């Protein structure tokens, strides 16, 4: 299905873990925070003793020592000790200035035991007010605004001051002390303290109370001990609220006060717990948002950002093992329900990399809708670093790209807050400590253990350093292990092998465990790696690992203590880069600003199922941090005591969500790059900076003023520009009651203008200042109270600054009240169009050694499906490159390459993408693909694949427009072209790859032998002359040769010159074996040579050995072998206990001979001879025995002339078994293994029992334990002797042993599988499109297996088969929960059956006739019309070319119909043209129509010949006219050429003299020049003639009146005709009328008749008739035969009336369209009425899970929308949608009936799921999934759905932890082709080995 074209799919943005939730504090400020709290929150009013509070405040006082300063600066990421003395003195630090006067708690104004809160506040304010003079003096010294004031338990305030100025502060009158603020490091909340969350809890008591956060993820375990509320009295969502919602929604349920609502949208049941074994992503996310743990042990408790917020468990990922993706329909439903139920914030830690920003994307549209309802959306940015970081997915650019963005969809949503990830300061994770108990102490160091089961597997073991051949630390190759590894912990180095192989080889060597040492030379722990879970393994950093290696090398016999335990450690990554290296770069590909903000996401400790915890990393972890913070902000807005509460209550919809986002971005703290002189980290990486939750809350409580760009976004998007002066405007909003002025920050670092740079040594991206660049305001920034001000700014760049670079930075504004505002800006200086969309062949990304072939042609063999890299050649140094002149394929079915496609490395996201094939003249042959967008290429770390755009293949055929058939294109040069527009640009780029279509094999002649002797050694060569006239000889110079049937399949040829007629002289060296087979005589030579298109020539010849003139006997294959066995070439067994050995050779005469048998008896050879080729064959009988034989060959039948004698040994005695036993003779077993024993004959070399090689003892006895599976097992035992003879015995053993009764317990028939099943009306045999019913059949493994589908128990028959039905309707994505169990075990597992279907084909209405031919003389033909469908996606193909498609990522459950206006040009060929138009929907239902058009070029016809009936005087003259050619029609005009009409068959009767014009016309619209014929021989004023004229005019008047009354002509020309008629009547009525006057009146009236314009022109008539036909087909008989109550006619009759009116032409097109619209409105109403009438209220009022509305509402919405449409084709699309809805509702009604009858053992269901699936009990995972292997702990977005786009050539799939692309890849596989050309001996060998001739990808290290 082409719904989701996303480069790998939506994944959970993090799979790395939550470090302890905690943060850097604010010195003595921990005490100060408590003080601040007392004056603001009533809960402290009478509960804290003043003395106690004072103690808490003053205990933290510290001397201003260097150590204290260093500690404070370290918390800000500054190494104080690395500063010089001047810098140390100039450094600003935080201090507390304490006053001499006593605080309120000590000055006697308060009684601490019972003073009220109001009194405390009042007296505290007095103390603070008295600080004014001292503050002013302090600010004079510090040049900084004083910070927070407090006056209850401490009389003082905070400020920043340079170290050198601290003594000055102490000298100010009224100052008691100046105390350096201390830094505290809480051990349980590192991430929270990074963003000042705890200060919010402490100062404001905001913890999320009264807020709801929706967690759209993999699920939540609501029973976790940390999923709690401290008090559930004032929750936002009560149980009543939830049950009210679920009563309407008809899904989901209430769980706990903490998790009040949840639903599994993926499986359509109430199981909201994620049953993934390794890690539960959604549970981790939920903990970060709102865990509310208790206790002091940070490893056993977590407190989230908003611990008192309620969480919604919106599970959108299935528990099925068959799929780890989700679809748009599922995701959109969860988003919509989040808004409906009243979530304040929704979090989506998921996405598809490198997304766009279009509302056509259903998820982005749903996010906007949620914003409009007031629900804020917070979404992860993604974990792919940059697109230029190759396989690493980090902050690097190896390619020098201008476009490195990777932010994923739906994080690109304009209204969402998109979150980047910063590293946590500390990390809780498994850590290892290694010691010998005295001298050695390594660690603790963070590790990733392969399984928690192995924590004790390394302790007190000996260690073994694995070394390679050079004595260095081995990378783990199997050959490097020795027997010493057994029982020890092996140590190897990272590199070359993937981790799983390293584990496998260590385990195979008998090691007890494995330690892998990193290879980067740093102290960075080796984590985030992919290990199997079955062998004890972990990694160490390079430095720690080397120390261990050194120790073990010196102490090889020591046993070491190894402790592995959860430990809180400093985060090594934080010291290297505060940002997480994986966080995805922005901006959006159209230069919109993203990401928005940064939060802690690297190494986060959070919750898991069953009261568990783990560490994970990713933007998945950063996003919920922001979601929790926005819950706190929302709580602040809802606080009625907030001074701005009244203003906040006015915020609704997007105004509210945009405000939350703006406040957080305006108060964020930009992060500096510690590796590059503390310059800023790019806003494209960090957004507005690290969230500061306290600063945001402070703003909401004190001054919520904001600054945004002119477009309202809290970041300036400069887009692309080329002028060095760029102006932009900012809007400042003052929400206070006093005027505010702002100054730009004077810090030159903060306020500098930056651009991007790349470290040449490491590829790391960083920002650098642009010297000479500046931003200045155009005026002072003054904002009146309660007003806004728009200020213009100018960005100035130096004239020398090069274009094609980013320009970015931060604008920091200091307010007159001490407030600060932060605003990032970003733009591109240059033309955004200019960056290439596609990497070239052998381009910057091309790296075969790294497994990346970049942009490369792919050639496919149709028989095998194997793919090969086109044009790939290897030079002398082994370097592979693509030679674009060698790219070719063949239309010959016998060739290896049968079609061509392209693997594109897209450097950018592109839109309006088209892929064409052009011929050698640049003419378009076909359009292979047309798509709205394609995603750039990137490396997906989880699937370990590059996500390329794999464009469709061309097989060398084309649509022949002349007859409508598909034909093979001519050989020649062609071009494979891709074109598209870079996202954000407006210029189309084109990238061409040349190739050749070549169906003819090369010609080869003059095959011969030559020889060269060097240093006494003779080298023989097979030479030839070869030529290929199109694609050229194989550029790899590969050739296969055979000499006397001795082959060399890996030979290469060299060019030895060119002949005069263009042949290439080639020579190929013979192998040593071939040279030895040469004889003096007729040597048989074969040369197998291909061209670049893979056409093969197999040329054989008889050649003489160079230098030899004699013709001796030659036996092929080097002669008769020394031994003849069953494996010898030429041996063929028979059924009589022996066989035949056949050999061949050459000799100038007939050959005869003899051989001896097993008894030594001599026999004649059976020989044949071909005199034409001097070749012979001979055969001899052999018996199944071992004996010596002699063969003699003679030149005569008398056997007197001996040519050659051979001695050979016949070895055909096969090995034998003695006492062979399987399972001790029993056919049955209940064990996991059986024993196979026996003895073999002494000549046996090996015994294979299944896949096991049995060990043979001295008596040739063997015994092997063979594993067996449940059911029948065929065990084969094969003995092989030294001669290759084999004997095989086999037996079938039936096993009842089944360690996992649920594994593969259920299988389905007819291709149905767990997970997604996509089909259309004709592609699934189990589905009936007429009823919408699917009948699912299958079989279970055990009689004890139980099966539940959609909450209903399925009956299992005695033969273990089952059958049940599901009501699927005709359109949609329907998930059904499945539970499989076993009555013998108390466990089940959950799966899902998801059906994605569309059983309704699109409608297609064309404006041109499809019944009758169309004729034209215009070569440019326009195909116009409309197509509709019941779903939103349509693609259009014309003549086999895919010319248009709509946005493919649709929500198939939306109920929105599809509509496509068709307006496509076609270039006509001369003569007949058959134009085929096909429209296809999302599930490949196709409707096709054909238009036949005849075209001839415009030409001038020969004039007709006019002949009068007489030239003599007469009363009348008849003029006849003949055209010059057949097929032409002659027309005449009597009004001087104003109008023409056909000449009647009898001619034109003329009654008055005058001039008549005649011209010829044809069907194509061609005309001849008009010729005049002047009639002068009419006798004037003859009474008879006058009477004739009167009669003619009378007749014409009558005809005119008939025409006027017909109603077929438009009003204007009908009115003109009436006037002409009246004028003619007046002339007729004149008593003195003359022949001339009457003739003139006749002529004028005829002109008016000729000028009548039809109400319905022919072209519009054809279009309308086609449309009416489509409507009738859509109605069918059932609906068509229903009666319209307003007319009393059936709808079919009404349509027939319209057809008749159209045929008659009595209505205009608009009138007919209006009438059709009325009919369709009536049809829609009738259909809707019928559906509603057939739907009981309990069903009609139930919720449609797909739309979230009731069925009645769905019906009404579709009806209303359809009737509101003005376009008939759109009404038709709504009719289709309503018909689909009818099927769905009917299914729902039937399901309700079934439910009312009780248990339905057939399992019929219509809901696409249900509520009957039980949730697993606490502690039970709900599934026994077996070992799936561990996943990497590096971030990744969970994929939403498999992408089946044209960017991949096979189905896209993903896992929860990462994306995985599709594509066949270019890996050739080994298989025999199904058809073989009629080649000779060598040709047959070569063709059978074609599959191994392609390129192999090197296995890469993970």
Swiss-Prot record:
One of its GO terms (cellular component) is membrane. GO terms for molecular function: serine-type endopeptidase activity. Residues 1793-1805 have a biased composition (Low complexity). SUPFAM superfamilies: PA domain (SSF52025), Subtilisin-like (SSF52743). It is a peptidoglycan-anchor. It catalyses: Endopeptidase activity with very broad specificity, although some subsite preference have been noted, e.g. large hydrophobic residues in the P1 and P4 positions, and Pro in the P2 position. Best known for its action on caseins, although it has been shown to hydrolyze hemoglobin and oxidized insulin B-chain. GO terms for biological process: proteolysis. Keywords: Cell wall, Hydrolase, Peptidoglycan-anchor, Protease, Repeat, Secreted, Serine protease, Signal, Zymogen. It is an enzyme of class 3 (hydrolase). The modification Pentaglycyl murein peptidoglycan amidated threonine is found at residue 1870. Residues 191-697 form the Peptidase S8 domain. Residues 34-187, 1871-1902 form a propeptide. InterPro entries: C5a/SBT2-like_Fn3, C5a_Peptidase, Ig-like_fold, LPXTG_anchor, PA_dom_sf, PA_domain, Peptidase_S8/S53_dom, Peptidase_S8/S53_dom_sf. Residues 1793-1872 are annotated as: Disordered. This is PII-type proteinase. It comes from Lacticaseibacillus paracasei (Lactobacillus paracasei).
């Amino acid at each position: 299905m082409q719904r989701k074209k996303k480069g790998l799919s939506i994944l959970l943005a993090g799979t790395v873990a939550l470090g302890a939730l905690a943060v850097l504090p604010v010195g003595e400020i921990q005490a100060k925070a408590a003080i601040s709290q007392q004056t603001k929150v009533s809960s402290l009013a009478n509960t804290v003793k003043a003395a106690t509070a004072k103690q808490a405040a003053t205990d933290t006082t510290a001397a201003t020592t260097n150590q204290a300063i260093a500690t404070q600066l370290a918390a800000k990421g500054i190494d104080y000790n690395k500063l010089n003395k001047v810098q140390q003195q100039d450094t600003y630090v935080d201090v507390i200035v304490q006053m001499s006067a006593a605080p309120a708690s000590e000055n006697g104004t308060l009684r601490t035991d019972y003073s009220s809160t109001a009194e405390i506040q009042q007296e505290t304010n007095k103390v603070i007010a008295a600080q004014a003079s001292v503050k002013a003096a302090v600010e004079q010294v510090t040049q900084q605004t004083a910070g927070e004031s407090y006056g209850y338990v401490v009389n003082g305030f905070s400020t920043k001051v340079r170290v050198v100025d601290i003594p000055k502060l102490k000298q100010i009158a009224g100052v008691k002390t100046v105390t350096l603020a201390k830094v505290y490091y809480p051990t349980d909340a590192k991430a929270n303290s990074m963003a000042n969350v705890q200060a919010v809890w402490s100062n404001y008591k905001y913890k999320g109370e009264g807020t709801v956060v929706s967690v759209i993820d993999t699920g939540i375990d609501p029973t976790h001990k940390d999923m709690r509320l401290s008090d559930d009295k004032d929750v936002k969502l009560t149980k009543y609220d939830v049950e009210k919602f679920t009563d309407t929604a008809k899904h989901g349920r209430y769980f706990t006060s903490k998790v009040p609502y949840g639903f599994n949208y993926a499986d359509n049941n109430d199981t909201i717990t994620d049953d993934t074994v390794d890690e539960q992503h959604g549970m981790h996310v939920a903990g970060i948002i709102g865990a509310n743990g208790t206790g002091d042990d940070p490893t056993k408790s977590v407190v989230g950002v908003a611990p008192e917020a309620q969480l919604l468990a919106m599970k959108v990922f299935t528990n099925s093992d068959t799929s780890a993706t989700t679809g748009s329909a599922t995701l959109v439903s969860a988003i919509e329900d989040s808004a409906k139920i009243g979530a304040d914030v929704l979090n989506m830690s998921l996405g598809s990399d490198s997304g766009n920003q279009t509302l056509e994307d259903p998820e982005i549209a749903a996010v906007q809708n949620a914003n409009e309802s007031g629900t804020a959306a917070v979404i992860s940015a993604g974990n792919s670093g940059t697109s230029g970081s190759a396989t690493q997915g980090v902050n690097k650019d190896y390619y020098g790209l201008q476009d490195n963005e990777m932010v994923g969809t739906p994080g690109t949503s304009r209204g969402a807050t998109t979150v980047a990830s910063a590293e946590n300061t500390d990390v809780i994770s498994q850590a290892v400590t290694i010691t010998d108990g005295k001298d050695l102490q390594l660690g603790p160091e963070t590790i990733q253990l392969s399984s928690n089961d192995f924590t004790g597997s390394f302790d007190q073991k000996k260690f073994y350093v694995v070394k390679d051949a050079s004595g260095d630390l081995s990378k783990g190759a199997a050959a490097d292990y020795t027997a010493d590894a057994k029982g020890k912990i092996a140590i190897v180095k990272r590199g070359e092998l993937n981790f799983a192989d390293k584990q496998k080889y260590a385990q195979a060597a008998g090691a007890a465990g494995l330690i892998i040492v990193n290879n980067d030379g740093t102290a960075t722990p080796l984590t985030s790696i992919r290990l199997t879970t079955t062998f004890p393994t972990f990694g160490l950093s390079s430095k720690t690992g080397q120390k261990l290696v050194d120790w073990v090398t010196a102490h090889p016999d020591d046993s070491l203590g190894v402790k592995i335990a959860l430990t809180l450690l400093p985060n090594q990554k934080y010291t290297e880069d505060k940002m997480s290296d994986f966080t995805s770069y922005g901006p959006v590909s159209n230069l919109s600003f993203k990401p928005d903000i940064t939060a802690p996401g690297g190494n986060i400790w959070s919750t898991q199922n069953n009261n568990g915890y783990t560490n994970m990393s990713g933007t998945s972890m950063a996003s919920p941090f922001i979601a929790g913070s926005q819950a706190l902000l929302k709580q602040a807005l809802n606080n009625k005591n907030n001074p701005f509460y009244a203003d906040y209550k006015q915020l609704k919809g997007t105004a509210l969500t945009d405000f939350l986002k703006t406040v957080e971005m305006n108060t964020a703290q930009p992060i500096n790059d510690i590796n590059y002189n503390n310059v800023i980290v790019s806003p494209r990486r960090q957004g507005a900076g690290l969230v500061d939750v306290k600063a945001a809350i402070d703003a909401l409580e004190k001054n919520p003023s904001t600054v945004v760009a002119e477009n309202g976004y809290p970041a300036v998007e400069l887009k692309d520009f080329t002028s060095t002066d760029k102006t932009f405007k900012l809007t400042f909003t003052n929400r206070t009651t006093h005027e505010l002025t702002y100054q730009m920050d004077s810090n030159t670092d903060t306020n500098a203008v930056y651009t991007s740079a790349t470290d040449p040594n490491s590829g790391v991206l960083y920002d650098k200042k642009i010297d000479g660049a500046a931003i200045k305001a155009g005026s002072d920034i003054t904002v009146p109270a309660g007003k806004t001000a728009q200020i213009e700014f100018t960005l100035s760049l130096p004239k020398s600054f090069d274009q094609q670079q980013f320009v970015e930075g931060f604008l920091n504004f200091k307010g007159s009240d001490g407030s600060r505002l932060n605003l990032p800006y970003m733009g591109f200086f240059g033309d955004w169009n200019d960056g290439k969309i596609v990497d070239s062949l052998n381009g910057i990304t091309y790296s075969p050694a790294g497994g990346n072939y970049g942009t490369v042609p792919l050639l496919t063999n149709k028989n095998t499906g194997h793919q090969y890299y086109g044009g790939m050649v290897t030079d002398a140094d082994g370097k592979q490159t693509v030679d674009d002149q060698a790219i070719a394929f063949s239309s010959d079915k016998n060739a290896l390459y049968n079609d061509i496609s392209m693997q594109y490395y897209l450097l950018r996201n592109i839109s309006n993408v088209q892929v064409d094939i052009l011929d050698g003249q640049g003419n378009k042959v076909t359009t292979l693909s047309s798509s709205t967008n394609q995603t750039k290429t990137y490396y997906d770390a989880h699937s370990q694949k590059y996500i390329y755009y794999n464009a469709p293949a061309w097989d060398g055929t084309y649509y022949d427009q002349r007859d409508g058939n598909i034909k093979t294109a001519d050989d020649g040069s062609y071009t494979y072209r891709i074109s598209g527009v870079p996202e954000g640009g407006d210029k189309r780029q084109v990238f061409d790859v040349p190739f050749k279509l070549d169906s003819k094999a090369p010609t080869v002649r003059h095959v011969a032998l030559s020889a060269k002797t060097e240093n006494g050694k003779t080298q023989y060569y097979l030479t030839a002359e070869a030529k290929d006239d199109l694609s050229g000889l194989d550029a790899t110079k590969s050739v296969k040769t055979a000499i006397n049937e001795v082959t060399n399949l890996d030979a290469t040829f060299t060019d030895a010159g060119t002949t005069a007629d263009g042949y290439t002289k080639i020579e190929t060296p013979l192998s040593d074996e071939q040279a030895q087979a040469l004889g003096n005589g007729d040597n048989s030579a074969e040369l197998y040579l291909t061209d670049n298109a893979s056409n093969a020539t197999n040329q054989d010849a008889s050649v003489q050995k160079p230098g030899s003139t004699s013709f001796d006997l030659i036996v092929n294959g080097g002669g008769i072998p020394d031994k003849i066995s069953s494996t010898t070439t030429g041996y063929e067994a028979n059924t009589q206990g022996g066989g035949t050995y056949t050999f061949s050779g050459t000799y100038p005469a007939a050959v005869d001979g003899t051989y001896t048998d097993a008894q030594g008896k001599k026999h004649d050879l059976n020989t044949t001879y071909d005199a034409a080729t001097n070749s012979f064959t001979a055969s001899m009988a052999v018996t199944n025995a071992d004996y010596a034989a002699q063969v003699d060959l003679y030149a005569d039948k008398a056997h007197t002339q001996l040519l050659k004698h051979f001695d050979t040994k016949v070895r055909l005695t096969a090995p034998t078994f003695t006492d062979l036993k399987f399972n001790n003779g029993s056919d049955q077993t209940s064990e996991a293994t059986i024993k196979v024993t026996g003895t073999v004959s002494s000549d046996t070399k090996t015994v294979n029992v299944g896949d096991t090689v049995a060990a043979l003892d001295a008596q040739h006895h063997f015994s092997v334990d063979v594993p067996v599976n449940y059911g029948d097992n065929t065990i084969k035992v094969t003995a092989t002797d030294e001669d290759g003879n084999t004997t095989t015995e086999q037996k079938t053993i039936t096993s009842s042993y089944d360690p996992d009764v649920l594994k593969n317990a259920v299988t389905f028939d007819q291709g149905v599988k767990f997970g997604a099943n996509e089909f259309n009306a004709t592609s699934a045999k189990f589905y009936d499109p007429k009823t919408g019913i699917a009948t699912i059949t299958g079989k279970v493994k055990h009689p004890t297996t139980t099966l539940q589908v959609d909450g209903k128990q399925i009956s299992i028959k005695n033969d273990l088969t089952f059958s049940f039905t599901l009501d699927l309707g005709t359109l949609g994505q329907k998930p059904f929960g499945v539970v499989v169990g076993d009555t013998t075990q108390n466990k089940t597992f959950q799966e899902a059956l998801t059906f994605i279907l569309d059983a309704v084909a699109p409608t297609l209405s064309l404006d041109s006739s499809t019944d009758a031919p169309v004729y034209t003389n215009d070569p440019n033909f326009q195909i116009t019309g409309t197509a509709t469908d019941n779903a939103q996606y349509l693609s259009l193909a014309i003549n086999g070319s895919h010319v248009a498609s709509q946005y493919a990522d649709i929500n198939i459950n939306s109920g929105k119909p599809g509509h496509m206006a068709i307006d496509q040009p076609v270039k006509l060929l001369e003569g007949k043209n058959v134009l085929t138009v096909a429209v296809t929907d999302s599930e490949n239902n196709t409707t096709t129509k054909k238009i036949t058009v005849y075209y001839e070029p415009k030409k001038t016809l020969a004039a007709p010949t006019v002949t009068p009936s007489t030239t003599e005087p007469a009363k009348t003259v008849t003029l006849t006219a003949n055209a010059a050619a057949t097929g032409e029609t002659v027309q005449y005009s009597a009004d001087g050429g104003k109008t023409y009409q056909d000449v009647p068959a009898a001619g034109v009767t003329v009654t008055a003299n005058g001039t008549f014009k005649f011209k010829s016309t044809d069907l194509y619209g061609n005309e001849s020049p008009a010729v005049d014929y002047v009639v002068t021989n009419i006798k004037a004023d003859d009474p008879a003639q006058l009477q004739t004229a009167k009669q003619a005019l009378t007749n014409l008047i009558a005809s005119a009146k008939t025409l006027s009354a017909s109603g077929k002509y438009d009003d204007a020309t009908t009115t003109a005709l009436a006037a002409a008629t009246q004028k003619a009547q007046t002339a007729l009525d004149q008593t003195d009328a003359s022949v001339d006057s009457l003739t003139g009146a006749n002529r004028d009236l005829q002109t008016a008749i000729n000028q009548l314009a039809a109400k319905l022109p022919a072209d519009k008539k054809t279009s309308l008739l086609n449309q009416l036909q489509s409507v009738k087909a859509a109605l069918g008989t059932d609906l068509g035969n229903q009666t319209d109550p307003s007319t009393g006619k059936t709808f079919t009759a009404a349509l027939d009336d319209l057809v008749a009116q159209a045929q008659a032409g009595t209505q205009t097109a608009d009138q007919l369209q209006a009438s059709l619209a009325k009919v369709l409105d009536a049809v829609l109403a009738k259909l809707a009425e019928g559906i509603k009438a057939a739907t009981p209220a309990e069903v009609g009022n139930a919720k449609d899970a797909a739309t979230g509305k009731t069925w009645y509402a769905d019906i009404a919405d579709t009806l209303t929308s359809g009737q509101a449409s003005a376009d008939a084709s759109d009404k038709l699309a709504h009719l289709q949608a309503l018909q689909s809805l009818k099927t769905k509702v009917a299914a729902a009604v039937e399901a309700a009936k079934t439910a009312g009858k009780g248990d339905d053992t057939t399992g019929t269901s219509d809901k696409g799921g249900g509520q009957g699936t039980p949730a697993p009990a606490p502690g039970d995972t709900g599934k026994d999934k077996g070992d799936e292997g561990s996943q990497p702990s590096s971030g990744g977005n969970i994929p939403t759905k498999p992408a089946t786009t044209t960017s991949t050539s096979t189905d896209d799939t993903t896992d929860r932890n990462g994306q995985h692309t599709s594509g066949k890849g270019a890996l050739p596989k080994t298989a025999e082709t199904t058809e073989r050309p009629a080649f000779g001996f060598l040709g047959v060998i070569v063709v059978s080995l074609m599959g191994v001739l392609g390129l192999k990808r090197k296995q890469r290290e993970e």
